[in-house]
Amino acid sequence: RGHVDYAGTRLVAVCDVDKNHLELGKQLVKDKIAAYHDFRDLILDPNVDIVHIATPPHWHGIMSVEAAKAGKDIWCEKPMTRTIGEGKRVMEAMKQYGRMFRLNTWFRFADPFYGLGTPVKPLKKLVQSGMLGWPLKVTISKHTGFDWKFYWVGKEYLEPQSVPSELDYDFWLGPAPYKPYNPHRVHQTFRGYWDYDGGGLEDMGQHY
């Protein structure tokens, strides 16, 4: 949504392995845009200059490296990768292919500060003025208001269920170990499972 509203960018393509999500992405833009099921097709699109990777983190490293190989710059959601090794490979790829990589920690720039109701711009101005001195230590302790049990707590046992027709579950899993489908593994609640993310700290800690 942010890319649609920002005058400095033009959204030319969307990609998702969930047909319903893909359709929602297409509807965000008034003009006709390309829609892809496979990210490898999107990064070969000559109309694409920058890719915004907003998948679960277990895909971040692979997609970033492949996008760099295809000559695209990358805007990637946090965390950069699930592991340090994956992160190092991404850094190597950026140097090897001469591409730019930007980690999206947009809570630092959003106004008001997401979840806290605190304006960002006055705080940024205060820090930049030097009035607080340097080095500066900031301790974040207030909960953001997210339902942490819903978003960040996995379950020990999940009853296997049928994969919905709109979701390519095998592609969604990608490099992760195979586990039978359950809706709690995908979309909003995937963060509670180490195969895909690292819970609340890995999800939210990097914003601050």
Regions of interest found by a model, annotated:
Residues 22, 59, 75, 88, ...:
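Tryptophan-centric aromatic hotspots in well-structured domains and transmembrane helices
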Residues 160-208:
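Glycine-rich, aromatic-lined ligand/substrate-binding cores of catalytic
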